[in-house]
Amino acid sequence: MSNGSNGSRPPGEPLIVLEGLKKAYRTPAGDFYALKGIDLEIYPGEFVALLGRSGAGKSTLINMLAGIDRPTAGEIWIAGQAVHKLSEAGLTRWRGREVGVVFQSFQLMPMLTCAQNVMLPMDFAGRYGLPRQQYARARELLATVDIAEHADKLPSAVSGGQRQRVAIARALANDPIFIAADEPTGSLDSRTADAVFAVFQQLVAEGKTIFMATHDRELASRVSRVLRIEDGLIVEDLRPAEAQEGRQHVVEMEA
């Protein structure tokens, strides 16, 4: 088993550090550990795919990184912030300002326009000035994901792939430290998934750090680093050259 990188790592200090991360859920049969002790470093500008079967711990780890849930034990350090020590109010503020989250199911507000959905995190964090200034930024972000022409439409008026682009723009609203994406292409057809994935690749090229949980082994083969999780433990940590050599492990994963 490997909880750290086997290959060369980017220069500089890690952006995200996980130390002994565990998460247990109480069940009638006793505590069930979804994460069993994760040690991990993620560096600025990396595009990391967390690959694993359903129930392996992917979403749990994403929720820990995004501040949606708390660990049972261990430490989470992101850009020098001890996330595991934050109060509930502090965690909510930190998450709203510093993390961009993209879910499989879009989670857009149906009665708000695409632009208004992108404005929500700005309003929550009290950033980017007056509503007209927030609207201008929302349009800029929608242009970044090539959907500005739909800014004033309701989510129901655009396609699934376009809704996911709106969700990505919303995740970028407060210029987050990193983006946590949980199966962001899981509900899309392959062509639309490729288009959404290309948006992520462009964001990484511009310097963003992305941590993406997926069961799509083909998409996972196109990132800068692949982690494989099984039964709450990271069992492989591969960078590009190693990922090619270790591809036989990836092809065993269930779609």
Range-by-range predicted roles:
Residues 226-239:
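H-loop (His-switch) and adjacent beta-strand-loop-beta switch element
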Residues 1-24, 236, 240-255:
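ABC-family P-loop ATPase nucleotide-binding domain
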Residues 15-222, 229:
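ABC family nucleotide-binding domain
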